[in-house]
Amino acid sequence: VTAHTDPGRVRARRRAAVRATAALALALVSPGLTAPVLAAPAAARSPDGPVALTQVHPFKGGDQPCAAVGDDVVEQTPWTHHFLGLSDAHELSTGQGVRVAVLATEVDGGVPALAGAVEGGQSADCLGFGTSLAGVVAARHVEGSGLVGVAPGASVTVVPTGDTGTGLAPAQAIAAGIGNAVGSGARVVLVGTAAWEGSAALDAAVADAAEADALVVAPATVPTTQGPLPGHPSQDPSVLSVAAHGVEGAPVAQGPLVLPTGDLARVDLTAPGDRVVGTGPGGGHVVTAGDGVAAAFVAGAAALLMAREPDLTAAQVRERLVSTAYSSPLGDADPLAGGGRVDPLGAMATAPGGTAAGVAGEGFVPDPSPHGSVDAPATAVVVCGSLLLIVLCVLGGAVLRRGRARGWRPAAPGEPLS
């Protein structure tokens, strides 16, 4: 019995087999194409040390105890130091001669890392947050510790602001603190914790600071039990509004915040603000996070630039820091990152007018994009190889069909080979 098969169906099945073979080959040689990998800056280091550190926060309940900070010290250099390229930056400037005012409830000025750096500090810090901010800005090197501030040559003036038991700082208190900071001669004013509401007095204090050529740096948001809210005075265009990014450079915020006016909350820059190792009251190290911590890094970067170029105005310093930041993949319109990640070395290595100076630094590390990134050369090789394999599979199928049709005999003169 001879079975007759529809030639059209046979050809269709063969074409399907060829396509399946090609698809399988493509999947085998290019598994990475199905899931782009997020780019991660090579300079980032894990913040985890060999010991568990106390985490400090900008706020606490009035009936909660003070932060219990031990005397453990991390010997490794924190990830933030590598991420910001501070070793190279300190070859150009340490912030010597620049006064930075830190608005916080308390700062323990007696810790070894802040010895000789702090004016107006207290002997204790219930929250521990103010001491960590001062350390981010200007901690000096201490033997056995890998921690050093962004501007270890700068001086810190502590301006007590907010309730020492809770950390809450209303707009009126911040306004008074900014006024006191400007009166002390500070060129940089760091607002440690923002207010969730503005006020006419706060607007006036910010205007007075700009008139006195002092740069106000403040957190973009204020944390609450209901989630983050837009911070004040960060919504003022003359204030450098800073948001936190994590160890891979991506913004910590999950989405933009909207003001009552319908406008998006302002963000000018991002800086490290997640799992940051800092100085704690008593001399031990702590872990902290948030936009206030990120603002402290930017305040330190401003001090570095002011010390290197003392003739720059506060507005020019602000513009330089924003224009030299590692920009977001979405550009300046990114509602979470603003101008991008602060780059202290880039800000100092860029001469007025935008001409880069010849300063050796760390290799460029592109910001991570939420859409991922693909290694272009490797991808090109994989794609070309995959296409070649597909072509060979198709041609092989055609030759196979012709050979079977001829019974595998040699082609007669003039008979097509394919």
Predicted regions and their residues:
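Secretory targeting and sorting signals
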Residues: 1-45, 383-400
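Protease zymogen maturation seam
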Residues: 3-6, 39-97
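C-terminal region of N-terminal signal peptides and the immediate post-cleavage residues
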Residues: 31-51, 359, 368-378, 397-408
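Subtilisin-like serine protease catalytic core
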Residues: 88-100, 107-118, 124-170, 263-266, ...
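Loop/turn elements at helix/coil->beta-strand transitions in domains of secreted/extracellular proteins
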Residues: 96-100, 153-156, 183-189, 211-216, ...
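Substrate-binding/access-modulating region of protease and related hydrolase catalytic domains
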Residues: 164-232, 286, 293
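Extracellular S/T/G-rich loop segment that most often corresponds to the catalytic His/Ser-adjacent loop
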Residues: 234-307, 311
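C-terminal subdomain of the subtilisin-like protease fold in secreted/lumenal serine endopeptidases
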Residues: 309-401, 412-418
